Amino acid sequence: MNQLLNNYTTLALINKATGDALRLEILRALASDAFGVMELCQIFDYRQSGMSHHLKVLAEAGLVSKRREGNSIFYSRMLPSKASPLFLLQQQLYRTLDQIPLPEQRVANVQQVKAERAALSQQFFASQGDGYREQQDLIAAFDIYGASVDQLLMNSPLPSLSHAAEVGPGDGEFLPFLSAKFQEVTALDNSATMLGQAKHYCEKAALSNIAFSCNDTQFFTQHPQHFDCVVMNMVLHHTPSPADIFNDIAAGLKDKGVLIISELCRHDQDWARTACGDLWLGFDAEELEQWAQNAGLSSGQSQYIA
């Protein structure tokens, strides 16, 4: 009886939350991205107190969840539980919302927020020299995950061994593994400083089949279905919109192409923001799987390293 009443209460809260046009727009904006309160205020040109109220109503209805990233709280769309009798209602709500585009100005504001995040990341890496590796090693040294990524690569069925790419190669430590396996390799980074370090590393190793591109992942949309494999080692937590990264890379992969990601599990080490330039404090496996699925990719092998 209590559960039945709870279901009616939740249904009433959902109806209340979705009975406001702005709250529906907020849910639409949170389709694949997470935003902080101030970012949502910027996107919707709305006062903070009012935005906080709308987010509270959506949270009470179980339509948004929040996660703490250091001193900041980010909101994202809450996925419906398949065990809930309201699963179909919530699923259909999201499907309907996602068929309705946000107004052009809202879209422009979203892109501005992402551009500001990207600028912070680029400023950090532009200021980095050899000291970056020392900081990065404090949280995720290449020696910890490099061999595991190579093993995943060796075990992955690939369309061919023609073209591979690494997004954010750091100082280039994984590029020799790709160079030995593929005919052509692209090292992609939107930081000229970091790309220069990777290039210097490869020159010292006399690797001749690697091209270096100072670009973001929109590069893949300009080279559709070109790559057999794309690798991202400890990069996603530096990106302004992880969902966009998946979409971009999916466009550049050949049919049955492989995307290999090594990433941090969600953690609470806030010092990584200032020391390592992290925008996100790791991710849950379910988040990665959802972004991959939304981009038209399917999950493959997984491995967890302590």
Give residue spans per PLM region.
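A short acidic, Gly/Pro-enriched loop at the edge of an enzyme's catalytic core
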Residues: Q218-V230
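N-terminal helix-turn-helix DNA-binding core of bacterial DNA-binding proteins
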Residues: N6-G50, I73-P80
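Amphipathic alpha-helical dimerization/coiled-coil segments
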Residues: N2-Q3, K82-G131
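A short SAM/SAH-binding and catalytic strip from SAM-dependent methyltransferases
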Residues: C229-S241
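Class I SAM-dependent methyltransferase SAM/SAH-binding core
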Residues: A165, G170-F219
